[in-house]
A protein has these predicted regions:
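Outer-membrane beta-barrel translocator/pore domains, especially the C-terminal barrels
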Residues: 3-279
Protein backbone atom coordinates (compact mmCIF):
# COMPACT_ATOMS: atom_id res chain seq x y z
CA UNK A 1 0.00 0.00 0.00
CA UNK A 2 2.81 2.37 0.97
CA UNK A 3 4.73 1.61 -2.20
CA UNK A 4 1.64 2.18 -4.38
CA UNK A 5 0.98 5.47 -2.61
CA UNK A 6 4.50 6.73 -3.24
CA UNK A 7 4.29 5.69 -6.88
CA UNK A 8 0.95 7.45 -7.27
CA UNK A 9 2.37 10.67 -5.78
CA UNK A 10 5.40 10.42 -7.99
CA UNK A 11 3.34 10.07 -11.15
CA UNK A 12 1.01 12.98 -10.32
CA UNK A 13 3.44 15.40 -8.63
CA UNK A 14 4.86 18.62 -10.02
CA UNK A 15 8.64 18.36 -10.27
CA UNK A 16 9.19 22.06 -9.58
CA UNK A 17 6.54 22.74 -6.93
CA UNK A 18 6.36 19.43 -5.04
CA UNK A 19 10.03 18.42 -5.02
CA UNK A 20 12.99 19.98 -3.27
CA UNK A 21 15.37 20.29 -6.16
CA UNK A 22 18.42 22.14 -7.35
CA UNK A 23 21.63 21.86 -9.30
CA UNK A 24 25.17 22.69 -8.24
CA UNK A 25 28.50 22.68 -10.01
CA UNK A 26 31.99 23.55 -8.80
CA UNK A 27 34.75 24.92 -11.00
CA UNK A 28 38.23 24.84 -9.45
CA UNK A 29 41.05 26.49 -11.41
CA UNK A 30 44.62 25.90 -10.26
CA UNK A 31 48.00 26.62 -11.77
CA UNK A 32 51.66 26.37 -10.85
CA UNK A 33 54.45 28.16 -12.65
CA UNK A 34 57.89 29.67 -12.13
CA UNK A 35 58.40 33.41 -12.50
CA UNK A 36 61.80 34.93 -13.28
CA UNK A 37 63.33 31.43 -12.93
CA UNK A 38 63.29 31.64 -9.12
CA UNK A 39 59.80 32.46 -7.87
CA UNK A 40 57.27 29.62 -7.60
CA UNK A 41 53.75 31.01 -8.00
CA UNK A 42 50.53 29.08 -7.32
CA UNK A 43 47.25 30.89 -8.10
CA UNK A 44 43.85 29.27 -7.59
CA UNK A 45 40.23 30.27 -8.19
CA UNK A 46 37.14 28.39 -7.01
CA UNK A 47 33.63 29.06 -8.31
CA UNK A 48 30.48 27.38 -6.96
CA UNK A 49 27.13 27.86 -8.69
CA UNK A 50 23.73 26.76 -7.40
CA UNK A 51 20.56 26.82 -9.48
CA UNK A 52 17.17 26.72 -7.76
CA UNK A 53 13.61 26.71 -9.06
CA UNK A 54 12.09 28.70 -6.18
CA UNK A 55 12.74 31.04 -3.30
CA UNK A 56 10.85 31.71 -0.07
CA UNK A 57 10.03 35.28 0.95
CA UNK A 58 9.12 35.77 4.61
CA UNK A 59 7.16 38.47 6.42
CA UNK A 60 5.48 39.01 9.77
CA UNK A 61 1.70 38.92 10.30
CA UNK A 62 1.26 41.34 13.17
CA UNK A 63 -2.39 40.47 13.69
CA UNK A 64 -1.85 36.72 14.00
CA UNK A 65 1.67 37.08 15.43
CA UNK A 66 3.13 34.48 13.07
CA UNK A 67 5.74 34.40 10.34
CA UNK A 68 4.28 34.15 6.85
CA UNK A 69 6.10 32.44 3.98
CA UNK A 70 5.48 33.02 0.29
CA UNK A 71 7.11 30.70 -2.26
CA UNK A 72 7.68 32.05 -5.75
CA UNK A 73 8.85 29.92 -8.67
CA UNK A 74 11.37 30.70 -11.35
CA UNK A 75 15.06 30.38 -12.11
CA UNK A 76 17.36 31.58 -9.31
CA UNK A 77 21.13 31.53 -9.56
CA UNK A 78 23.11 31.56 -6.30
CA UNK A 79 26.88 31.59 -6.64
CA UNK A 80 30.03 32.35 -4.67
CA UNK A 81 33.74 32.40 -5.41
CA UNK A 82 37.12 32.79 -3.75
CA UNK A 83 40.67 33.16 -4.92
CA UNK A 84 44.14 32.67 -3.50
CA UNK A 85 47.72 33.24 -4.54
CA UNK A 86 50.96 31.99 -3.01
CA UNK A 87 54.56 32.65 -3.94
CA UNK A 88 57.74 31.10 -2.59
CA UNK A 89 61.41 30.83 -3.42
CA UNK A 90 64.64 29.40 -2.02
CA UNK A 91 67.81 31.34 -1.29
CA UNK A 92 71.09 29.51 -0.74
CA UNK A 93 74.13 30.58 1.22
CA UNK A 94 77.41 28.64 1.31
CA UNK A 95 80.34 28.92 3.66
CA UNK A 96 83.54 26.93 3.23
CA UNK A 97 85.57 26.56 6.39
CA UNK A 98 89.13 25.65 7.21
CA UNK A 99 89.91 21.89 7.01
CA UNK A 100 92.11 22.23 10.08
CA UNK A 101 89.00 22.07 12.30
CA UNK A 102 88.17 18.53 11.14
CA UNK A 103 91.54 16.85 10.78
CA UNK A 104 92.27 18.46 7.45
CA UNK A 105 88.95 17.31 5.95
CA UNK A 106 87.29 20.02 3.79
CA UNK A 107 83.90 21.06 5.12
CA UNK A 108 81.12 23.35 4.04
CA UNK A 109 77.98 24.82 5.62
CA UNK A 110 74.88 25.38 3.53
CA UNK A 111 72.04 27.66 4.60
CA UNK A 112 68.68 27.38 2.79
CA UNK A 113 66.23 30.23 3.39
CA UNK A 114 62.65 29.64 2.16
CA UNK A 115 60.26 32.61 2.35
CA UNK A 116 56.61 32.25 1.36
CA UNK A 117 53.74 34.70 1.13
CA UNK A 118 50.08 33.79 0.58
CA UNK A 119 46.99 35.82 -0.19
CA UNK A 120 43.33 34.76 -0.07
CA UNK A 121 40.11 36.66 -0.68
CA UNK A 122 36.35 36.14 -0.85
CA UNK A 123 33.76 38.96 -1.05
CA UNK A 124 30.83 39.44 1.30
CA UNK A 125 27.98 37.46 -0.23
CA UNK A 126 25.68 38.80 2.46
CA UNK A 127 25.74 42.15 0.68
CA UNK A 128 22.40 43.42 -0.67
CA UNK A 129 23.77 43.44 -4.24
CA UNK A 130 23.66 39.63 -4.33
CA UNK A 131 20.16 39.25 -2.86
CA UNK A 132 21.02 36.11 -0.90
CA UNK A 133 19.77 37.60 2.38
CA UNK A 134 16.77 39.75 3.26
CA UNK A 135 15.03 41.18 6.34
CA UNK A 136 11.52 41.82 7.59
CA UNK A 137 10.18 43.87 10.48
CA UNK A 138 8.64 41.99 13.39
CA UNK A 139 6.33 43.62 15.95
CA UNK A 140 5.40 41.41 18.90
CA UNK A 141 2.26 41.57 21.05
CA UNK A 142 3.90 44.11 23.37
CA UNK A 143 4.71 46.45 20.52
CA UNK A 144 8.43 45.70 20.50
CA UNK A 145 9.89 46.10 17.02
CA UNK A 146 12.84 44.07 15.76
CA UNK A 147 14.43 43.33 12.42
CA UNK A 148 14.65 39.65 11.45
CA UNK A 149 17.22 38.54 8.91
CA UNK A 150 16.76 35.45 6.76
CA UNK A 151 17.78 33.93 3.46
CA UNK A 152 15.20 33.08 0.78
CA UNK A 153 17.39 30.08 -0.09
CA UNK A 154 18.21 28.76 3.41
CA UNK A 155 16.07 25.63 2.93
CA UNK A 156 17.22 25.00 -0.62
CA UNK A 157 19.02 21.82 -1.53
CA UNK A 158 22.56 23.25 -1.53
CA UNK A 159 22.06 26.09 0.92
CA UNK A 160 23.36 29.62 0.54
CA UNK A 161 26.84 31.20 0.69
CA UNK A 162 27.96 32.48 4.07
CA UNK A 163 28.07 36.12 5.03
CA UNK A 164 31.12 38.26 5.61
CA UNK A 165 34.13 39.27 3.56
CA UNK A 166 37.32 37.29 4.08
CA UNK A 167 40.80 38.33 3.13
CA UNK A 168 44.19 37.55 4.59
CA UNK A 169 47.89 37.77 3.85
CA UNK A 170 50.16 35.16 5.43
CA UNK A 171 53.92 35.07 5.76
CA UNK A 172 56.13 32.10 6.50
CA UNK A 173 59.92 31.79 6.61
CA UNK A 174 61.91 28.60 7.01
CA UNK A 175 65.63 28.04 7.54
CA UNK A 176 67.70 24.90 7.10
CA UNK A 177 71.39 24.68 8.01
CA UNK A 178 73.53 21.62 7.35
CA UNK A 179 77.21 20.77 7.14
CA UNK A 180 79.03 18.58 4.63
CA UNK A 181 82.42 17.06 5.47
CA UNK A 182 84.56 15.25 2.96
CA UNK A 183 85.21 11.69 4.12
CA UNK A 184 86.29 8.38 2.66
CA UNK A 185 83.87 6.45 4.90
CA UNK A 186 80.80 7.47 2.89
CA UNK A 187 80.09 6.18 -0.63
CA UNK A 188 79.20 9.70 -1.78
CA UNK A 189 82.49 11.06 -0.51
CA UNK A 190 80.71 13.45 1.86
CA UNK A 191 79.06 13.14 5.25
CA UNK A 192 76.05 15.35 5.94
CA UNK A 193 75.47 16.72 9.43
CA UNK A 194 72.20 18.48 10.23
CA UNK A 195 72.74 21.58 12.35
CA UNK A 196 69.22 23.04 12.17
CA UNK A 197 66.69 20.91 10.34
CA UNK A 198 64.20 23.77 10.44
CA UNK A 199 63.88 27.12 12.15
CA UNK A 200 60.73 28.86 11.02
CA UNK A 201 58.19 31.54 11.83
CA UNK A 202 54.74 32.41 10.52
CA UNK A 203 52.26 35.25 10.85
CA UNK A 204 49.14 36.54 9.11
CA UNK A 205 47.20 39.75 8.58
CA UNK A 206 43.38 39.62 8.47
CA UNK A 207 42.24 42.40 6.15
CA UNK A 208 38.57 41.82 6.98
CA UNK A 209 38.90 42.16 10.76
CA UNK A 210 37.78 45.39 12.40
CA UNK A 211 40.48 45.25 15.09
CA UNK A 212 43.52 43.10 15.95
CA UNK A 213 44.25 42.30 12.33
CA UNK A 214 47.67 40.82 13.06
CA UNK A 215 47.83 37.24 14.28
CA UNK A 216 50.22 36.04 16.95
CA UNK A 217 53.73 35.13 15.86
CA UNK A 218 54.34 31.37 15.77
CA UNK A 219 57.89 30.02 15.80
CA UNK A 220 59.12 26.46 15.38
CA UNK A 221 62.42 24.63 15.72
CA UNK A 222 63.32 21.10 14.64
CA UNK A 223 66.69 19.47 15.33
CA UNK A 224 67.97 16.12 14.07
CA UNK A 225 71.36 15.80 15.71
CA UNK A 226 71.05 12.04 16.12
CA UNK A 227 70.08 9.45 13.55
CA UNK A 228 66.74 8.33 14.99
CA UNK A 229 65.90 11.25 17.28
CA UNK A 230 64.08 14.45 16.44
CA UNK A 231 63.59 17.38 18.79
CA UNK A 232 60.64 19.72 18.14
CA UNK A 233 59.87 22.99 19.85
CA UNK A 234 57.06 25.47 19.19
CA UNK A 235 56.51 28.89 20.73
CA UNK A 236 53.89 31.63 20.39
CA UNK A 237 54.37 35.37 20.91
CA UNK A 238 51.41 37.74 21.25
CA UNK A 239 51.32 40.67 18.85
CA UNK A 240 49.22 43.17 20.76
CA UNK A 241 50.39 44.78 24.00
CA UNK A 242 48.54 45.12 27.26
CA UNK A 243 47.10 48.52 28.12
CA UNK A 244 45.30 49.88 31.19
CA UNK A 245 41.70 51.09 31.23
CA UNK A 246 40.45 54.05 33.28
CA UNK A 247 40.24 51.81 36.36
CA UNK A 248 43.79 50.55 36.00
CA UNK A 249 42.76 47.09 34.80
CA UNK A 250 44.89 45.52 32.05
CA UNK A 251 43.39 44.57 28.70
CA UNK A 252 44.73 43.68 25.26
CA UNK A 253 44.83 46.97 23.37
CA UNK A 254 45.18 47.91 19.73
CA UNK A 255 48.89 48.76 19.80
CA UNK A 256 51.45 46.17 18.77
CA UNK A 257 54.36 45.05 20.91
CA UNK A 258 56.87 45.98 18.22
CA UNK A 259 55.30 49.44 18.05
CA UNK A 260 56.48 49.80 21.63
CA UNK A 261 59.96 48.55 20.75
CA UNK A 262 59.41 44.99 22.01
CA UNK A 263 59.65 41.67 20.18
CA UNK A 264 56.38 40.20 21.39
CA UNK A 265 54.71 38.93 24.53
CA UNK A 266 55.65 35.32 25.24
CA UNK A 267 52.51 33.16 25.35
CA UNK A 268 53.89 29.68 25.83
CA UNK A 269 55.89 26.88 24.29
CA UNK A 270 55.87 23.13 23.80
CA UNK A 271 58.60 20.64 23.02
CA UNK A 272 58.94 16.93 22.42
CA UNK A 273 61.39 14.24 21.40
CA UNK A 274 60.47 11.79 18.66
CA UNK A 275 62.17 8.45 18.12
CA UNK A 276 61.98 6.63 14.79
CA UNK A 277 62.49 2.89 14.50
CA UNK A 278 64.14 1.94 11.24
CA UNK A 279 63.14 -1.47 9.84
Amino acid sequence: CSSDLKEDKLMHSNLIKDWRNGMQHNIPVNANFTLFNYLNVTPSFNFTDRMYSNKVTRSWDEERQVEVSDTTYGFHNVYNWNLSLSASTKLYGMYTGSPRLFKKHPWQIRHVFTPQVSFSYAPNFGSARYGYYDTYQKTDANGNVSLVEYSPYSNSLYGVPGKGRTGSISWDVSNNVEMKIKTDKDSTGFKKISIIDELGASMSYNMAAATHRWSDLSMRLRLKWWKNYTFNMNAVFATYAYELDENGHPYVGNHTEWGKGRFGRFQGMSQNFAFTLNP
